[in-house]
Structures are given as C-alpha cells and as structure tokens.
C-alpha cells in the first residue's frame, strides 16, 4: 500500500529505493531489516485502490519519496488530480499533492474550485529535513507553506530516522573543544599548518596522485585562504577561480569553471571503457548548483554536518567541473563547517587523511558514493555509448561519449536521497577528530617535550634537534656517521645515550608512529 502500491500500479522503478514499505497484516507492527522499514497496518487502514487513496496514504503515513512522485506525476493524467482537488478543495493531502505536482513537473494544474483551508506545511518536518521555519514560503495558490529545502532542479531528501538524527546531532565544535581541553588551544593551533597540508596531500592520494608535491602545496594554500570565505563557491566565477587555483597552469583544460561538455566517471580496463557514473548534462548544471545554494540558504541554523554533507555530496553527483571535482567536493566539507561556525579558523579537519590511510574507511567512502551511482547506472544500461567520432565542445573538451537518458536520470539527479551520506559524514568527522587529530596532537606534544629535553642536554637550534630525532628513529637509536660529522658534540661520552633516552621518554606515552615519515612530510612544506 502507499508508495509501494503507486510504484507497482504505475510501473515505476525508482533508482533510490523505497525505505519504508507499508503492508496490511493481522496486527500493527514495525520491522526493520537491512535499513528498510516495513510498516504492518491492520485491515481498517487499507486505502481505496485509487491514485487518490494511496497517494493520500503515502503523504500521510510515509516520508514522501520525491523521486517516486516525480516519476508518478509524469505518468498519470493530470485530470485525476484536478478532479480530486475539485472534490476536496480544502483537503490537506489534495493540496499537498497539487503543489508537489506543479513543483516536480513544472506544469500547472487546471483548478476549478477555489483552494481553501488553513495553511499547511508541504513536508512533515518530523519525517524529513525541511526548510528552517523562517525560510518557509507561504504559497497563496495552494494555501501551503513551501518548506521544501531546495528547488525543482535540486531538492535532496534526508530522512529522519534513528541513525540520521544521531548523525545530525553530532557537535563537531564540542569534539574539537574536548581536544583543546586535553592538549591546549596553543598546541592545536600549532598543528593547523600540518593538518592543512595533510588534508591536501591525502586528497590527492585518494585520486592516486600522492607525489604531486607542488600541487599538494598549492591545494593546501587554497584550503588556508579560501575555506569559509566569501559567498558559497558554487557559481561560474567562484568555481572558475577555485578550480584554476587548485589545478594551476599545468593543465590541458582550455577553460575553467562550469563545464560545457558531458562527463562520466570511469576507467579503461583491457582497452574497454567502464562507466561508473554519468553526471547531469552541462545545460542542467547551473540550475542544479543554484539548488544547492538554495538548500544551504533555506536550512540555515540546522545541523552543520547535514548541510556540509548535502553540499559536498550534492556537488560530487552534479560533477560540474571537467577536472578537480573530487578535491572541491572534499573542500566543501570544511568550507561549510567553517561557515556554520562548527570549526573555527584557521583549523582544517584532515578528513581525506583518514580515507586515504585506512583501507576500511576508503572502502566505506567508495561504497557511500556508490549508493547513488551503482543503482543509477543499472537503470541506465543501454542508454550510453562511445561513438567513432569525437565532438569538440564549447569548453574545449573533446569527447565521443554520448548519453541518451537525461530524461530518465533527471528524477534521480535532482531528488537524491542523501540520508546515508549524512550518516557517513558524521562517522567520518567523529573518527577524524577523536582518532586522527588526537593522534597528531599527541605527536606534537611528544615532539615538543623531546625538543625541550634535548636542549637541557645540549644547546642546539630546533632544525638540528629535528634531524637528531629523525636519526634516532631511522637508525634504531644508533649515532650515524653523517650526523656525528655534522654535530661532533654528539660523539662525547654519554651525550648521545642521554639524547636517545630523552627522546624515548618523550614519546613513551605518545602515539606509535613513524617519526621519519612524519618529518619527511614536514620538511617538504
């Protein structure tokens, strides 16, 4: 019944699965299996076998599935809704259905009766993320409060269940404050440069480009200067500038900013093109990015975790650039958290570090991206091809990729269910702060203690102390010939042994990590 009946009766196969299945049984129960909730209702709850009956049930008892409704409204005869409205001009579910029809199709219904009754919210804020109350818009035509968080071109849904509510309640600033209490604000600020560089390096590592040192430094500079600054970086001018700074001059791109060519995510295996994801057509991108901005404007004051997830994952699924989408996607997480005051300047959370260094986390990240791409590509089988001839597009990109399924995919691209992405990002942020950043803070504290202890044994500049610490690590505590020649005083009786003991004591309670690799990374900055 409800959404499941509508899908079956009208032959609709949505890409985003129905997360709530309603059925009739002997008693009222709720069952949850593999993330799918099955609601069992008694016979008296069965709707009439009509569009009106089951659509009312869906809007009343289930979290509205906008992708399903978008596909449904293009299949039905509009007269079915118009007659419903004529019969119930003040009915709350008839009014909601009429508004959503026009919102999702862009078509206007012929209304024969005056719509009356009190103003009602279009979506139930207890079931879905909706616009903040002050950003809801009264609609006089339908006598509803438009509290959809986005636009017809981009209006993702985030379902409110136990896991997503917990994720959205994650207090990032409190987690960072806990670190500050343990290690002190000064130490956290001293680690900022390292964490920014680490985020940059790891962001390239995710894309298989970990050794691009000049590009890593350039992206680190972008993170430092641009995070949380100015207006949302989602229009042509801002994206063009951001992309050019990230990519630099050594690129084959002839034009920066929003692409004017088709794009897909894929690989070549044994001379065969494998397509993992197809992005929206270039003609749709501007309006979709405006939808992301609208979402951010209309959800002001709500969960920073939720808002950063929608901005970042919305961006990656829109894929508005010809190159650099992944780095901007991860940049947006820190950018929105900074704008929402969840992370204070100049701190950058090294989220990419955890993804790139932990194979299980990398698998989770890839899997969360596949939540949309895999079922979408299954639905688009046979609708794309690689032609023998190439086309040169307005942005200079040459491509022989041709996609024939824009109309099929728009329902999904525009109405993504990003609930799991929000849950994942909360998990990633919590691990980054509680584990990755804490480990880094422990290291910095131990390193400072080692420096201080060595200075009490023999005076030397910090740069030499750092070489000594690296040498102790790489040579298992033995004094190397090179270091003994560079710093002869280390050859004096007991000095080297005292230094080794001081370093061991400083790092005894710290993290088990490779000092050599840490310093190798730091010395490149």
What residue ranges belong to the model's regions?
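FIC/Doc superfamily catalytic core
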Residues: 1-322, 327-525
């Amino acid at each position: 019944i409800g959404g499941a009946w509508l899908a079956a009766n009208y032959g609709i196969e949505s890409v985003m699965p129905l997360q709530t299945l309603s059925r009739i049984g002997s008693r009222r129960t709720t069952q949850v299996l593999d993330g799918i909730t099955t609601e069992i209702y008694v016979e008296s709850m069965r709707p009439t076998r009509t569009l009106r009956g089951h659509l009312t049930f869906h809007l009343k008892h289930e979290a509205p599935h906008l992708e399903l409704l978008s596909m449904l409204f293009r299949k039905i005869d509009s007269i079915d809704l118009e007659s419903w409205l004529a019969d119930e001009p003040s009915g709350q579910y008839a009014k909601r259905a009429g508004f959503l029809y026009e919102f999702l199709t862009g078509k206007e219904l012929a209304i024969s009766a005056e719509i009356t009754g009190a103003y009602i919210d279009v979506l139930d804020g207890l079931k879905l993320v909706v616009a903040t109350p002050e950003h809801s818009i009264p609609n006089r035509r339908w006598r509803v409060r438009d509290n959809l968080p986005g636009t017809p071109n981009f209006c993702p849904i985030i379902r409110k269940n136990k896991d997503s509510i917990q994720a959205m309640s994650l207090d990032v600033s409190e987690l960072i404050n806990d670190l500050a209490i343990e290690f002190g604000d000064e130490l956290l600020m001293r680690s900022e440069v390292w964490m920014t560089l680490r985020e940059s390096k790891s962001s390239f590592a995710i894309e298989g480009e970990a050794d691009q040192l000049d590009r890593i430094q350039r992206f680190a500079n972008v993170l430092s200067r641009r995070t949380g600054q100015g207006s949302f970086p989602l229009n042509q001018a801002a994206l063009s500038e951001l992309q050019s700074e990230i990519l630099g001059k050594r690129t084959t791109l002839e034009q920066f900013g929003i692409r004017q060519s088709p794009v897909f995510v894929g690989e070549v295996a044994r001379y065969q093109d494998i397509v993992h994801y197809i992005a929206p057509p270039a003609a749709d991108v501007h309006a979709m990015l405006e939808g992301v901005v609208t979402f951010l404007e209309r959800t002001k004051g709500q969960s920073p975790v939720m808002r950063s997830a929608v901005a970042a994952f919305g961006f990656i699924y829109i894929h508005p650039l010809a190159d650099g989408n992944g780095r901007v996607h991860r940049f947006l997480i820190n950018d929105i958290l900074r704008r929402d005051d969840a992370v204070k300047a100049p701190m950058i959370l090294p989220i990419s570090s955890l993804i790139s260094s932990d194979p299980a986390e990398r698998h989770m990240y890839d899997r969360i991206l596949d939540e949309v791409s895999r079922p979408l590509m299954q639905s688009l089988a046979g609708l794309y091809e690689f032609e023998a001839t190439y086309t040169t597009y307005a942005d200079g990109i040459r491509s022989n990729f041709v996609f024939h399924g824009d109309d099929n995919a728009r329902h999904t691209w525009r109405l993504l269910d990003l609930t799991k992405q929000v849950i994942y990002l909360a998990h990633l942020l919590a691990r980054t702060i509680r584990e990755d950043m804490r480990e880094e803070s422990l290291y910095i504290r131990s390193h400072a203690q080692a420096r201080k202890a060595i200075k009490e044994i023999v005076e030397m500049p910090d740069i030499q102390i750092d070489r000594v610490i690296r040498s102790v690590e790489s040579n298992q505590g033995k004094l190397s010939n090179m270091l003994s020649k560079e710093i002869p005083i280390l050859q004096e009786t007991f000095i080297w042994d005292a230094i080794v003991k001081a370093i061991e004591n400083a790092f005894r309670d710290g993290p088990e990590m490779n000092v050599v690799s840490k310093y190798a990374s730091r010395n490149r900055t």
